[in-house]
Amino acid sequence: MEWLADYWWIILLILVGMIISGIKELRRVDVKRYLADKPELPPHRDNNAEWDDDDDWPKKK
């Protein structure tokens, strides 16, 4: 662990570089185009279907 005390700044530079690179890549994402081309999620299997009829919640009027 002695090398960590000597070369901590190199590790810090690598981490800062990774964060800056990630920010640059996230800026390139076109959110509107992504949301327009997003695939539909398939319906999920409801494992609680047999208990759905036994709800204790009050009915909405």
Curated annotation (Swiss-Prot):
Its main location: membrane. Keywords: Cell membrane, Membrane, Transmembrane, Transmembrane helix. Pfam families: UPF0370. It is found in: Cell membrane. Residues 49-61 have a biased composition (Acidic residues). It is a single-pass membrane protein. The keyword Transferase does not apply. It comes from the Bacteria. Residues 38-61 are annotated as: Disordered. GO terms for cellular component: plasma membrane. InterPro entries: UPF0370. The keyword Transmembrane helix applies. Signal peptide: none annotated. Residues 38-48 have a biased composition (Basic and acidic residues). The chain crosses the membrane at residues 3-23. NCBIfam families: PRK13664.1 (NF010185). Belongs to the UPF0370 family. This is UPF0370 protein Spro_3503. It comes from Serratia proteamaculans (strain 568).
